[in-house]
Amino acid sequence: MAKKGARVQVTLEHKCEQGVYRYHTTKNRRNTTDRLELKKYSPVTKQHEIFKEIK
C-alpha cells in the first residue's frame, strides 16, 4: 500500500530544454502547495539554471 504522508516525490525538469535533464527530489505537500522552482546545476549548459516541477 502507498504511504499517506505529506512528503511526495517530484521531478524537476530544465526550464529551457524539456526532456534533456531532470532531477528527482521530495517536497512536503502541506507546506509547499505550489510547484517547486529551484536553481540547480545543468550539465548540458554547464551552469546553474532554473528547474521547474513537472507532473
UniProtKB/Swiss-Prot annotation:
Signal peptide: none annotated. The keyword Protease does not apply. GO terms for cellular component: chloroplast; ribonucleoprotein complex; ribosome. Keywords: Chloroplast, Plastid, Ribonucleoprotein, Ribosomal protein. It is found in: Plastid, Chloroplast. One of its GO terms (biological process) is translation. Its main location: plastid. GO terms for molecular function: structural constituent of ribosome. Coiled coil: none annotated. The keyword Ligase does not apply. Pfam families: Ribosomal_L33. Belongs to the bacterial ribosomal protein bL33 family. NCBIfam families: PRK00504.1, PRK00595.1, rpmG_bact. PANTHER family: 50S RIBOSOMAL PROTEIN L33, CHLOROPLASTIC (PTHR43168), LARGE RIBOSOMAL SUBUNIT PROTEIN BL33C (PTHR43168:SF2). This is Large ribosomal subunit protein bL33c. It comes from Emiliania huxleyi. The lineage of its organism: Eukaryota, Haptista, Haptophyta, Prymnesiophyceae, Isochrysidales.
